[in-house]
Amino acid sequence: MNISSRIKKNLAFYLLAAVFAFAPLCNADAQSDDNEFGIWTTLEASKKINKKLKLDFEAELRTIEGVGDIERVSLGAGASYKFTKWLKASAGYIFIYSHSLEEKKPKTDDPLIIDGIGTFYDYNVDHAYWTERHRFHLSLTGEYKIGRVELSLRERLQYTRTNSAVTDESKYRWHQQFDADFNEIEPTLELKETAPELKETKYNTTLRSRLTAKWDIAKCKVTPFASVELYTRLDDWKGCDKMRYRIGASYKINKDNSVSLFYMYQDANDDDEPKGHAIGLGYSIDL
């Protein structure tokens, strides 16, 4: 092995190590900034029908709060068609079984204010529940190579239906208390009631614009990559809803098998995922 090849392979190793090193840092940052941290694991399989047409299958499991809770499980299938060397189109369907964690919702109106003691807000608690989502997507991807760097821009239009679900809502209320001399003291918190709550069906149409850069290192099985993705909701236009950033690398085991590792940060909450960080692990196979 010559010096140049050794440098390239060492560089690839350090890039992978850097992604691993992000994990504990991300978790600490997530806890301090009220962001979430999770692990995303993906299994992908593809079958080439001919030079232009390919079928794709995907299964994914995501956790939240580290590995404490499952956030969602999904299964997807799709197809892509390559028009030219640099342009392809794809379409697919994803079934998502999503877990909404328990949520505390403070009531900011009419708080109980006690001088010298504090301000106390009533609140409601939505209990955890599962719901089904059906997602359809259409994509157009263009690719362009600059030396050993491949740039790609994917524009994806996705439509998501989130089915209705029933959960329980608990209402907690503060009650004013007095001592024997009728002085206000620490109030007591009581559960007023727990009743079923209907989460109505939701519809979401979003445009996702993702720019990706891959570095093809000569004579090396590791391919570093980075991407930035912009989400724009079309049925409730407010400009850019969120940004998602990824950095990672893939490793080609052999002709048909590869694994990948990445770090992801998302800068805003939405109906799909919470704001926060994730470490992703993936396995891909060509059938």
Language-model features, listed with the residues they occupy:
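Outer-membrane beta-barrel translocator/channel fold
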Residues: 64-66, 70-71, 86, 90-170, ...
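Residues on the lipid-exposed face of transmembrane beta-strands in outer-membrane beta-barrel proteins
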Residues: 41-47, 77-81, 138-142, 157, ...
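Bacterial Sec-dependent N-terminal signal peptides
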Residues: 1-33, 287
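Start-of-domain marker
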Residues: 31-99
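Repeated loop/turn-to-beta-strand initiation elements of outer-membrane beta-barrel proteins
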Residues: 52-57, 86-91, 147-151, 219-223, ...
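Residues that define the transmembrane beta-barrel architecture of outer-membrane proteins
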Residues: 37-39, 71-73, 132-136, 201-207, ...
